[in-house]
Amino acid sequence: MEHIQGAWKTISNGFGFKDTVFDGTSCISPTIVQQFGYQRRASDDGKLTDPSKTSNTIRVFLPNKQRTVVNVRNGMSLHDCLMKALKVRGLQPECCAVFRLLHEHKGKKARLDWNTDAASLIGEELQVDFLDHVPLTTHNFARKTFLKLAFCDICQKFLLNGFRCQTCGYKFHEHCSTKVPTMCVDWSNIRQLLLFPNSTVGDGGVPALPSLTMRRMRESVSRIPPGSQHRYSTPHAFTFSASSPSSEGSLSQRQRSTSTPNVHMVSATLPVDSRMIEDAIRSHSESGSPSALSSSPNNLSPTGWSQPKTPAPAQRERAPGSSTQEKNKIRPRGQRDSSYYWEIEASEVMLSTRIGSGSFGTVYKGKWHGDVAVKILKVVDPTPEQFQAFRNEVAVLRKTRHVNILLFMGYMTKDNLAIVTQWCEGSSLYKHLHVQETKFQMFQLIDIARQTAQGMDYLHAKNIIHRDMKSNNIFLHEGLTVKIGDFGLATVKSRWSGSQQVEQPTGSILWMAPEVIRMQDNNPFSFQSDVYSYGIVLYELMTGELPYSHINNRDQIIFMVGRGYASPDLSKLYKNCPKAMKRLVADCVKKVKEERPLFPQILSSIELLQHSLPKINRSASEPSLHRAAHTEDINACTLTTSPRLPVF
């Protein structure tokens, strides 16, 4: 017993185990001696013994309410001790900060350097927190039925009913919820980190970010390393508990059945993929010379991350006993500009033959998931104002869906601005009327006029002014289906003086309205100017000729039409042209734009005209053999005796 009391006195004084305690010839077994360090016996000063003081360990509180105990060896730094514990959780020391908890000052902590000798911290309690500039995001799970073919990102099996994160797109079965990575990659913040590796700190601690074109953005985003299984998955996935106490606070989601796990409650606040952060930090450290670049700090947080809708968050304190309201708070996901998804890489489109060129660009036939038409616009070195105006118009064009409108498929910005539309196998109306001289029936001409008016009525309902309406931009697709192309794009069809858009008469003069030629208004293009151009198209349909064919001087046409001295000769209309169509042509080409009808009225007039045309209705009775061309060659006996032929 004397040996036991001596050993215990040594332990309680804080000097640790001595070799004589284990090497002695005492009858006490080593197992019993090792258990003395865990006995709760007070020392002479009345304090309890800390078991970590008696061994080379450090207790560490990690993010997300996790903790661990690490062993310390001589010569190891904090970075070496905590590397493994952080790696298995998908963390990087470069993204975190380590603190020593000051128990003598409750709630306070002192930051430590990662190169600190770990041996000097034996028995202490440490805490690891995220750095403020690391983009954090939480999963936003929602139950979803996948109507299209989908597979679970965890087990790679077919997925019909499951869950999907609305932020990162991770999808999984219900029984795979415990294997979902806790890291939700916020790609809007990752793109900011990769776009601005050379950002410098400006006034007020806000990084000054350079202005980029879409081409540089596309090249920057292409540096994102691909994931292993899922495009948003992280390589450091680990399992976590799928249960959460009800006292943690309720989310702003509907209450789900208690028989299924509420996977939305398993949201974890962790940084993005460690490999992406590592690459971004490496590229940031390799880029040397800082340069002061101009940027608007209104939309930036103190760490430089774009936050268009939410204010900059306050500095986070992640003490072990902190409240969980902030952790359960749903973070709004960053919204990407939807026009981003309509941009096509120039390397994906293969141009083949040159179809033709016009006032605003050159059209090529190309291949992009099938035959497409690529119109390379005549815009050299677009200014930022032109580029933004072009993107704004593309945002309008991509919403057009109509049977009589060419389908907009995307746009390109590399090297040149270009528009990609569907390919029409047929020829343009101009080629049919004036080159091939196709002979159409009157009801066919009226139907072409109706479809054209129907497509223009749709464009005007979308507040899109064509600005270049003519027979060259009307295509007959698969028979007599009208497709209107080359609409909108006021950015390309206007002249720019510096950063200001200046209107000028561009396009084909034969289809120009008089007010457009005169250019007395700042913006002469209107719905009525499109109606005048449509009236010239009607004139082409009903005469088979171009207007002013007797005038060979272009400047003379501009002068006479602009002054109101010349107008299309309506006496050349076909003799079998209905009177209603003649009146419509005359109304559309009136010199005063306020007197011209709009397309809803035009479409209604043509539809009434179509209904009034005489039609030969086909008989609904059964076919008769008497209508055969050579009924005398049919053997009546064969008809009555052959079992294979029907008898009428």
Swiss-Prot record:
Activity regulation information from UniProt: Regulation is a highly complex process involving membrane recruitment, protein-protein interactions, dimerization, and phosphorylation/dephosphorylation events. Ras-GTP recruits RAF1 to the membrane, thereby promoting its activation. The inactive conformation of RAF1 is maintained by autoinhibitory interactions occurring between the N-terminal regulatory and the C-terminal catalytic domains and by the binding of a 14-3-3 protein that contacts two phosphorylation sites, Ser-259 and Ser-621.
EC number assigned by the record: 2.7.11.1
PTM annotation (Phosphoserine): residues: 29, 43, 233, 252, 259, 289, 296, 301, 338-339, 471, 494, 497, 499, 621, 642
Keywords in alphabetical order: ATP-binding, Cell membrane, Cytoplasm, Kinase, Membrane, Metal-binding, Methylation, Mitochondrion, Nucleotide-binding, Nucleus, Phosphoprotein, Proto-oncogene, Serine/threonine-protein kinase, Transferase, Zinc, Zinc-finger
Biased segments, Low complexity type: 241-252, 286-302
Top enzyme category: transferase
Residue sites binding Zn(2+) 1 per the record: 139, 165, 168, 184
Residue span, RBD domain: 56-131
Domain of life: Eukaryota
Residues involved in Zn(2+) 2 binding: 152, 155, 173, 176
Post-translational modification: Phosphorylation at Thr-269, Ser-338, Tyr-341, Thr-491 and Ser-494 results in its activation. Phosphorylation at Ser-29, Ser-43, Ser-289, Ser-296, Ser-301 and Ser-642 by MAPK1/ERK2 results in its inactivation. Phosphorylation at Ser-259 induces the interaction with YWHAZ and inactivates kinase activity. Dephosphorylation of Ser-259 by the SHOC2-MRAS-PP1c (SMP) complex consisting of SHOC2, GTP-bound M-Ras/MRAS and the catalytic subunit of protein phosphatase 1 (PPP1CA, PPP1CB or PPP1CC); this relieves inactivation and stimulates kinase activity. Methylated at Arg-563 in response to EGF treatment. This modification leads to destabilization of the protein, possibly through proteasomal degradation.
PTM sites of type Phosphotyrosine: 340-341
UniProt cofactor note: Binds 2 Zn(2+) ions per subunit.
Pfam families: C1_1, Pkinase, RBD
Biased composition (Basic and acidic residues): 275-285
Residues with PTM Phosphothreonine: 269, 491
Role this protein plays: Serine/threonine-protein kinase that acts as a regulatory link between the membrane-associated Ras GTPases and the MAPK/ERK cascade, and this critical regulatory link functions as a switch determining cell fate decisions including proliferation, differentiation, apoptosis, survival and oncogenic transformation. RAF1 activation initiates a mitogen-activated protein kinase (MAPK) cascade that comprises a sequential phosphorylation of the dual-specific MAPK kinases (MAP2K1/MEK1 and MAP2K2/MEK2) and the extracellular signal-regulated kinases (MAPK3/ERK1 and MAPK1/ERK2).
Protein name listed in UniProt: RAF proto-oncogene serine/threonine-protein kinase
GO (cellular component) term, any one: plasma membrane
CDD domains: C1_A_C-Raf, RBD_CRAF, STKc_C-Raf
Localization annotation: Cytoplasm; Cell membrane; Mitochondrion; Nucleus
Biased composition (Polar residues): 253-262
Span of zinc fingers (Phorbol-ester/DAG-type): 138-184
UniProt KW Mitochondrion keyword: yes
